[in-house]
Amino acid sequence: MAYTPMIKQYKEIKEQNKDCILFFRLGDFYEMFFDDALIASKELEIVLTQRDCGENKKCPMCGIPYHVSDVYINKLVSKGYKVAICEQLEDPKLVKGLVKRGIIKIYTPATVIENENSDTGNFNYLMSISKKSNEVAISYIDISTGDVSYTNTTSDDIYKIIENEISKITPKEIIFNDHEFSTNSLETIASKFSIVLTTVNNGTDSIDFINSKITYDNTNSETTNICVANLLKYVFRYQDDLVHINSSRKYYINEFMEIDSNSVINLEIQKNLYTNSKNGSLFGVLNHTKTSMGSRLLHSYLERPLMDKEEILIRQNRVEEIFEDYELLVNLENCLDGIYDLDRLIAKLSYKSANAKDLIALKVSIEKIPYLKNLLNCNKKNVQLIGEKLDDLRDIYDLIDKSIVDDPPVILTEGNLIKPNFSNELDQLRYNRVNGKNELVEYEMSEKDRLGIKNLKIVFNKKLGYFIDVTKSNLNKVGEDYEKRQTLTNSSRFKTKQLEAIESKILDSEDEIFELEYKIFEDIRKIILENLSRIKKSADLIAIIDVSNSLAKCAYLNNYIKPDINTYGLIDVLESRHPIVELSVGQSEFITNDILIGSGKNDIQLITGPNMSGKSTYLRQVALICILNQIGSFVPATKANISIVDKIFTRIGSSDNLFKGESTFMVEMKEMSNIIKYATSNSLLVLDEIGRGTSTYDGLSLAWAIVEYISKDIKAKTLFATHYHELTELEKKLDNLINMKVDIKETNDSIIFLRKITRGSTDKSYGIEVAELAGMPKTLIKRAKSILKEIDKEDTKIDLPIADFAVQNEMEDDKNIHELKDFKDEIKNINVNEITPIQSLQLLNELVIKASKLGD
């Protein structure tokens, strides 16, 4: 088919960007054609129309105004589409024929900058992953804040490392080289977190490219260099001067508390389990921030709790100083409220997409900094230190205040941006325009008098410019100097040479004004760009104060206390509470529990009790309190002395991975294998109902062996909830294990959960009573009780002296190990060079006989 020149140009550009919806610039609109139009009209809910595309045929078309394109781009990208921006690369006024066009940007889920109406308290991370053998490198950036972070590590289980990092960072998009990875493995992880995967090719100039963009440690491994280079190349593809992206931070995974991906989900750190929203999560409880920068920093705190005691204390002390001064807390809150997202504004300035309204938002935010500095100058050491570092950016405020009108338009090329008295040249052009319009008014009045047409009027529209409108009844009064340009039903429109002269004076002035205002705005934007690092530092400090104030308010509202920190492995908390659950049931209704675990004597708590009795709440609250401690927060308790924990692992509830065809039990065993492999004596393990996914004896045996292994080989602080009451015998066998139970009050026909965790054990599961509370039919409950009574009467319950068997088996295992070691040493000591062939055969026969006598 012979397309029109413009459609042919569109098709050629689209061919190079098949995976994108192409926004094709035509005048004041971005147009979409063919399949893109069908998709965009549906997703954006805009009118679908048609356009001639050649040979009298039409193609689907829809369009959006260019000056509001960011809204529509965000909508499409949030639904998983990529958007390519095809701009006019020449001024249509200066070109005859087809305007040259080309791609200037491609927006993907992680490379779009949200508009002012978006939830900018979230990060919008792009992640890059590279690997070689057992080394993996991970880098990530939120292009709207410009922060580049990267790490590398070696592991036999690379995909577990990747999954753990993804669960913390929650990127919108991951780029990787599919020659390095098992695509299926990455797809499984990405689908779990709803992340877009994009394949890229590794470059050959990694170090040179990185150094041309950011400050970077050149001693990193080749894998790390490739990873960071891929990240930056993806960001800088169509925009080479993003000045806000200029530095990088290397972090080490073991420098922070490690929270595996299951724990991030099970503990509801960032989102709740049921609606996947922030409400009902730990973040939701803590978040009283007033700025988007503060909200994102709080996310970062929860992603990576600290391990360094001194750093934790600095955060805690800031929170304490604000907590103890409620007036300061309220004043800080009021001052922070209304500060715009400075990180996003910096990014828009760097992208050269900031408009005059963005500069006013920057001015309004900077205006609050002197008040903030004054509040922080309060003789409180840690808070005051932030205030002293805070740049008031007065010069930038003054520049914007003197130059930009208070309520500017969004469009930058139609004037009304710059205040009077800022530019003499602009003031003169405006004076000329005013004179021209005065002259126009005088000409209209003189023509009314000269022709005797009282309703004659001079009107303007974009198509005709200025013209004289004369009603039909007065057309006979018009002179020969009137040149007709348009005939309407009730009037006609005319031009005269004098009107054209006045029009030229006005329009020439307006064109010059628009051009000059835009140039002045660009100059102002350039000056601000040169000071982005100063604005960024102030934004970071504002975020720190905002988070400190937020944590202080949370502590004030919820009656938290400042914990002491120890390094000898003890977690000792009085009247602890679950920070999330207590808000749903009410603090007065929540049953508190003391926590005492660690320091070698009671490293393992074996907890028995029925379902719904409060075991899981207790398990989770211990872990959450440790996390709160290490982000520098106060904790929900009356007193606390908490050791620094290096890792938190949880195995709570079933999580069948049907996508991979794995059963509950297989998933459970894989997770336990991971925990046993990576846990240390400084870790906290939260384990609920291990072994329940298989037969009773298999499950009991595995649970027993796991507890023993943790006790003897790992020595981690462990909360182990179980229905296997036989395991309580382990308290007699293991010095670092104690039995705990959930208190139950029994009546004649029901039970009451007291939700109090105390020393001791229970040998009843109360399963029938729980079923009754859950609303099972009374006839069914009655039948179940009858069956249980008969079982107890007939003593059909198997009495398994498992503790005796376990001890006996362990002794036999130890004996076998020693015999095998002696046998191995005997073989190693044979010198084959000093014996004859006959002796060799005799020795081999003896070894076979000895081997047959050894245990399995």
UniProtKB/Swiss-Prot annotation:
Family that this chain belongs to: Belongs to the DNA mismatch repair MutS family.
A single Gene Ontology CC annotation of this entry is: cytosol
Keyword list, A-Z: ATP-binding, DNA damage, DNA repair, DNA-binding, Nucleotide-binding
UniProt keyword rRNA processing present: no
| Matches recorded under InterPro entries | DNA_mismatch_repair_MutS, DNA_mismatch_repair_MutS-lik_N, DNA_mismatch_repair_MutS/MSH, DNA_mismatch_repair_MutS_C, DNA_mismatch_repair_MutS_clamp, DNA_mismatch_repair_MutS_core, DNA_mismatch_repair_MutS_N, DNA_mismatch_repair_MutS_sf
Summarizing the function annotation, the protein's role is: This protein is involved in the repair of mismatches in DNA. It is possible that it carries out the mismatch recognition step. This protein has a weak ATPase activity.
Pfam families, per this entry?
MutS_I, MutS_II, MutS_III, MutS_IV, MutS_V
Q: Molecular function (GO) terms listed?
A: ATP binding; ATP-dependent DNA damage sensor activity; damaged DNA binding; mismatched DNA binding
Protein name as it appears in the record:
DNA mismatch repair protein MutS
Query: What Gene Ontology terms for biological process does this UniProt record contain?
Result: mismatch repair
Q: Where does ATP bind?
A: 609-616
The organism encoding this protein is Finegoldia magna (strain ATCC 29328 / DSM 20472 / WAL 2508)
Question: Which HAMAP family has this protein been placed in?
Answer: MutS
